[in-house]
Amino acid sequence: MSTLTAPVPLTEPELKLLQTLVYQECGMYFDERRTHFLRDRLQRRLKACQIDSFYSYYRLLTSREGKQELVALLENLTVNETSFFRIRPQLELFQKSVLEELLRRKQERRDWSLRIWSAGCSTGQEPYTLAILICDALAYYYLRNPLPFDMPTPKPLIPPPWKVEIIASDINYSALLTAQQGIYTESQMETVDYTCRLRYFDKVGDKYAVKPALKNLVQFDFHNLKTEYLPQRNDAIFCRNVMIYFDEAEQKRLIEKFHRCLNPDGYLFVGHAESLFGLTTRYHMIHQNNATVYQRLEAAQ
């Protein structure tokens, strides 16, 4: 090893080896349009490890001792672009249509549990947004449909006997740590209005911390979507702007996994620019007000 001052040369066969390893580990596919990004991230890790040859680094990645470095590489390949209340038309569809239907259906069955999975949660803004939307939706729902008993004092965010569980997962440990801390800067809070800040956040210096009552609704965990061990019995899954990093074969496998992870008639939200068209017939597409959600079907149509 030596102190690196110049990029390590990388041949096409070496790049192909790295592409294959990344694909096998997490399903991310780097086509010709994204090889520059892959090369750049590889050079960063070579410099960080002070390794001056690709094959030395590859041997490290594939060794038992290199598991931590493999995690570091995969973290560098993920893009943690997220914000509170991102893609508002989808969130309005979730709150005003999907949640309304779920609450009505579950109350009829005396099923008081609600389970949502945020797959690819990054630094936590999406699952905390979902928690806020659910709390607001439950409050509004019971203004119009009173509970058959008195509400406890002080009023909890989630009225009993409801139990809300939001599973938030990512492959990036650093992003998960930020999400678990639940502390955000003023610029990260730009899309959160004043009333919402007062109700769900505490001001800590020049930052904002998610209030414990809201934070307790979200459980953060490491999950690799390539594996079969994924959260089950979900009423809705949010996996937005994740499948764009997968090839068609991996997209189809992931969509099938989500089908198994959803409750009957559960809902799948994907990115605004993503679609299940041509990938599966096991979901019914619902489109309202420039937003789309896919509802699980019980059998191929």
Please place each PLM-identified region on the residue numbering:
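A short glycine-rich, Lys/Arg-flanked "PGG" loop and its adjoining helix->strand segment in the class I
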Residues: 252-264
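Residue-level signal for inorganic ion chemistry
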Residues: 94, 237, 262
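A structural alpha-helix within SAM-dependent methyltransferase catalytic domains
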Residues: 95, 131-135, 259
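Conserved AdoMet
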Residues: 2-117
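Conserved beta-strand signature within the Rossmann-like core of class I S-adenosyl-L-methionine
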Residues: 264-272
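Extended basic-aromatic, gly/pro-enriched interface segments that bind polyanionic ligands
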Residues: 119, 140-238, 242-253, 275-277
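Core SAM-dependent methyltransferase catalytic element
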Residues: 236, 277-301
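Conserved SAM-binding loop of SAM-dependent methyltransferases across substrates and taxa
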Residues: 123-144
